Amino acid sequence: MIPRRSCWLILLLNLLNVQSLLDASWWSTVAQLSTALAGHNVKPVCELPGLSPGQAQVCELFKDHMPAVSIGAQNAIQECQRQFTGHRWNCSTHYSTGMLGPIHKMATREAAFTYAILSAGVTHEIGRRCKQGLLTSCGCSDETKPKNVPTDWSWGGCGDNVEYGYKFSRDFIDIREKEHDPKRNHDNGRSLMNRRNNEAGRKILKRHRKPKCKCHGVSGACNMKTCWMQLPSMEQVGKILRNKYDKAIRVQINDRGNLQLLADEATKERKTRALPTDLVFMDDSPDYCRFDRHSGTLGTEGRVCKRGSGGAEGCDSLCCGRGYNTYTQEVKSKCNCKFEWCCKVVCQTCNNVTQVDICK
Amino acid sequence: MMLFPVLYILFAFSVTNGYLEDSWAMFSSERPVGPKCVDIPSNLSICNGIEYTQMRLPNILEHETVSEAIHASKDWESLLRLNCHPDTQRFLCSLFAPVCLMQMDRLILPCKSLCMAVKQGCENRMANYGFPWPEMLSCEKFEDDDMCIKPMQPAKPPAGSSTTCTACSQVATYENLVDQFCRSHLVLKAKVIRDSPTHIRVRNGRSLKKGERRRGVSDVEIRLSSESDGSCPCNIPVKNQNEKLLVMASRQPDGKYLANLVLPWQKEKNFKRAIHQFQRLNCQSLGREIRESASRRPHYYEMRRHNTGRYQMF
């Protein structure tokens, strides 16, 4: 009797483990797509375990798009880390478990931010590659001239094709949230939240495009210009989404299976519905202080903090009251660089001794 | 009975192994797109002969592709051939095809002193043809520091010698010859005598000015340098006394001539083309013609690339 029970327990634990691995590795899979395409991996490109069946089909049909998906995701994660540098949650990748990209097992506002910026990153990179002529099925933007461009400037050039990027990103990323995957429990609320936040990221990219104008010719006053529509940079997108993150709206799933503002949320904000570009979440965030496999948090142990600072990166806040250790660090760097024609840069080497505070 | 736990443990381990294997391969994947080095193509003509071979994209003028930089640089080829300053190429090339150094991210900009030197030499001549110094070449945005491209150091002349006369160091490009023609009152194909350190004397010459064809000119004295007491070398490679030169000079307020250009007569294509043009050139409308020809060129940004196919999911 006792041996049988232990057998079943082990089996159950492994199944649960597989499910959480599959879920958490979704964006890790996206990041691996270009690796597979580069031939560093024997595994067939579109059979990576994190792709859903529908996504695998899209991958087969649009193989030349996959490097853009991968790079767009990587750029998004970099921008995410830049926005949250020094915060307890800093969009870190969980290298020790071999999985890449942020892991969000709970429907927190951090998950909302991550999904939105990843979706925006993919849209951005696809649109940019259309402009550069790197994808066979799309080219320059077809957009007409907006009204705020002076009439005597010409409208032409090659604009970023955000329309195409938007459609592809929506179809490729959201298809996963619509499918019923037998390998995982179907969580309708979480899927709706993910789709909502993905769409917010894409819409923010679309709404913040603006005309880019360039002078041409030997004109002195720059009165000859050609303009086209250009996407915002990922830095700008990160900044906008960061504001949305600070004002994220809590929702819940209602009886009819739709997302709905919480009652107290609606009363407090005096509005009955969220904007299409608002981020939404369903769960409270953990404090991100301790390593917790169950909730997928890394903790702040070993993080570099700033002594005496009152902000998020200050040691009192970042270390969650556990204190910090101070280490002396000697850094060699290049200094007093000079450019010599033609063509090299000559630098001296400087030694700098600094102190680094690290959370206990 | 003991066999089952072992099998399940192996299963879990192999799953973990698969993910670890995939994740490590990621580190060799394609890097995010950023500034990059590309070879300077030969049809980026303003940089032909420059001392470096790789340029950085995007460049300082925000051109994102090589073809965009090439297209925009063609407007400036004429300025370069005008030879209005010895550092023109270094300056223009540093903007259109900036030096690319793999080990560092920062842009190598031209020094403000380089920009000002080129502007001082070229601004007036551009203005003659209706082209004010453009905003995109404004010197305000450059700084003099240790990491910028400095003006060329002039070669130190030997003791007791002075620099070559400006008139004797001209280039025989079409643009320069036509420009000098329009600024000169006297344009001759002539045999000359160097009868003093500061002057040449026309021994036997023929005017090339419109309406003055075949008018013989002789015994005209032309000063070589505008500086008083200026004596400067004018080492025209003349094989013998009968070698013919192209001589251009301006009439000064005192009625005397100051040399603008002294070159040996050549059979080279651009030289002959310019000489042939002298008879039909209208100097009053030259500036307007140049501006209009510049405006007629199709602009890079109007050459759109349209969709090659329609987007369809299934």
Swiss-Prot record, chain A:
UniProt keyword annotations, A-Z: Developmental protein, Disulfide bond, Extracellular matrix, Glycoprotein, Lipoprotein, Neurogenesis, Secreted, Signal, Wnt signaling pathway
| Tissues in which the protein is found | Expressed in intestine, pharynx, anterior body wall muscle, vulva, some pharyngeal neurons and SMD head neurons. Expressed along the boundary between the intestine and muscle or hypodermis, but is also expressed in the hypodermis in cells including seam cells.
Give the record's GO biological process terms. anterior/posterior axis specification; anterior/posterior axon guidance; canonical Wnt signaling pathway; cell fate commitment; cell fate specification involved in pattern specification; embryo development ending in birth or egg hatching; interneuron migration; motor neuron migration
> What are the disulfide bonds?
80-91, 130-138, 140-158, 213-227, 215-222, 289-320, 305-315, 319-359, 335-350, 337-347, 342-343
Q: What happens when the gene is disrupted?
A: Anterior displacement of the nerve ring in L1 stage mutant animals. Defective ALM, BDU, CAN and QR neuroblast migration and irregular CP and CAN axon growth and guidance. Double knockout with cfz-2 results in enhanced CAN migration defects, but the same QR neuroblast migration defects as the single cfz-2 knockout alone. Double knockout with cwn-1 results in ALM, CAN and HSN migration defects. Triple knockout with cwn-1 and cfz-2 results in enhanced neuronal cell migratory defects.
Modified after translation how? Palmitoleoylation is required for efficient binding to frizzled receptors. Depalmitoleoylation leads to Wnt signaling pathway inhibition.
**Domain of life where this protein originates:** Eukaryota
* GO cellular component assignments: extracellular space
Signal peptide residue numbers: 1-37
Where is lipid attached as O-palmitoleoyl serine?
219
Q: What are the subcellular locations of this protein?
A: Secreted, Extracellular space, Extracellular matrix
Note one Pfam family from the annotation.
Answer: wnt
**Keyword hit for Aminoacyl-tRNA synthetase:** no
Q: Which residues are glycosylated?
A: 90, 352
Write one Gene Ontology MF term: frizzled binding
InterPro entries tied to this protein: Wnt, Wnt_C, Wnt_CS
The UniProt similarity line reads: Belongs to the Wnt family.
Q: What does the function comment of this entry state?
A: Ligand for members of the frizzled family of seven transmembrane receptors. Probable developmental protein. May be a signaling molecule which affects the development of discrete regions of tissues. Is likely to signal over only few cell diameters. Involved in the correct positioning of the developing nerve ring and in axon guidance of SIA and SIB neurons, probably by binding to tyrosine kinase receptor cam-1. In addition, regulates the positioning of some head neuronal cells, muscle arms associated with the nerve ring and the excretory pore.
The name of this protein is Protein Wnt-2
Record organism? Caenorhabditis elegans
Q: Which gene encodes it?
A: cwn-2
